[in-house]
């Protein structure tokens, strides 16, 4: 076992050494061709993103066609929309508790409310409303830090698919497992991105972890733990004048990411619609959605 481990470490070191050599050669070539500093910096950014987001076998393909067209429009747009809605409610009806909800937001047409489940848009629009400063900042930071590199690699359509799958999974799961609670925040979508990314990291652990860095990974895990802590607080330890908020979206979004998200993010250089894993994940997801719809119509305690 020790010999195998030594061989794996030696192979990893050789790969990293080869990549560094290729970087130096490419930068030298750009200088000779008059490519300029801007082009060299852009290429360096794409190389870093490829190491963090892709296994080694896919990095070359990405770097050959790497560009910022289209730019990461989806993640930036959804983040601006969430921030705009938060500012609107904070100014119109200032929140009395920075980590709970007030009556102004509880009456919002965006929030998921168990009494108004027939308004189907609420199963998606709840992602625009947040339960306080730390809630909006936590979600925005996580989805921008992870979502922008993901969208640079996989483009907006795929990232949007995973994000919205997590949002819908979050509200439907909450309607089943916590049927009498309100739901706000984009955590379902954020955790879907994280679930898909980290499944890809785990499957390609030996290739991606050295490039990504254990320290960065631990920071992200710490952020997740803190976010889950606040979610549990909002659910179980709210003040008397506050309203408990479900945290089921975090878990359901993570599972959506580990299924659909992993399949989407692991098919970087392949046709997604031709991958049987994608259709298996979609079929399982739709089965869960249909069950949730049936539950809400016929079995929910909120009826």
From Swiss-Prot:
Q: Which residues cross the membrane?
A: 72-92, 128-148, 159-179, 183-203, 212-232, 245-265, 278-298
Q: Which residues form the active site?
A: 187, 250
SUPFAM superfamilies for this protein:
Rhomboid-like
- What's the effect of swapping residue 187 to A/G? Abolishes protease activity
Changing residue 122 to A: reported impact?
Answer: Abolishes protease activity, prevents processing and alters localization to the plasma membrane of N-terminal fragment
**Where do the record's region annotations for Disordered lie?**
20-39
Q: Where is the composition biased (Basic and acidic residues)?
A: 28-39
The job of this chain, per UniProt, is described as: Involved in regulated intramembrane proteolysis and the subsequent release of functional polypeptides from their membrane anchors. Known substrate: EFNB3.
Name of protein: Rhomboid-related protein 2
Native source species: Homo sapiens (Human)
